């Protein structure tokens, strides 16, 4: 399992602001290999797994064939994500293209946008063909996209702990 804990509070991470809950969950994402901040590790591991699957098919070891077959496999696996969240899929494609091109700043920005970070440069979002920030409505779709990536990467799922103890301590007991 991948695991994440989100501290729910009235001011910093209210439960009704799903975009904030999603962002905090991605910031605290942990796996067995990476304690905190495993979001990029999960993405990179998923793309690596695609290439490993292509190599296991025996599709050829030259770079051009590997890249072409990896792109085809990427599109097959992104089909479900694309139907649910086209922006998530577009940003994943652009992230991979930036990684391949050695454009680490764009890749970093897109990983930030995919994880719900609000202050990503417009030029980076434009490179992926996406607009705006991850909002309340997109947050659950993005979470669904992450779950598909986790499943495809061999994880059993995501254990998400929503800790509301701070909020509950302020609730009046005499009501």
Model regions and ranges:
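Conserved P-loop NTPase "ATPase switch" module shared by AAA+ and STAND
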Residues: 154-174
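P-loop NTPase nucleotide-binding core
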Residues: 1-153
């Amino acid at each position: 399992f991948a695991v994440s804990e989100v501290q729910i509070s009235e001011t910093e991470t209210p439960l009704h602001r799903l975009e904030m809950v999603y962002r905090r969950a991605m910031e605290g994402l942990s796996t067995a290999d990476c304690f905190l901040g495993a979001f990029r590790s999960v993405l990179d591991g998923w793309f690596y797994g695609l290439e490993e699957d292509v190599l296991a098919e025996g599709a050829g070891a030259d770079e051009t064939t590997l890249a072409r077959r990896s792109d085809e496999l990427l599109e097959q696996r992104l089909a479900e994500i694309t139907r649910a969240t086209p922006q998530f899929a577009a940003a994943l494609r652009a992230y991979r293209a930036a990684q391949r091109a050695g454009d680490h700043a764009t890749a970093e920005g897109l990983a930030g946008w995919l994880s719900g970070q609000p202050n990503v440069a417009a030029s980076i979002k434009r490179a992926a063909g996406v607009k705006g920030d991850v909002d309340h409505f997109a947050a659950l779709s993005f979470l669904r996209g992450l779950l598909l990536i986790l499943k495809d990467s061999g994880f059993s799922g995501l254990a998400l702990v929503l800790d509301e103890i701070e909020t509950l301590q302020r609730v009046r007991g005499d009501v």
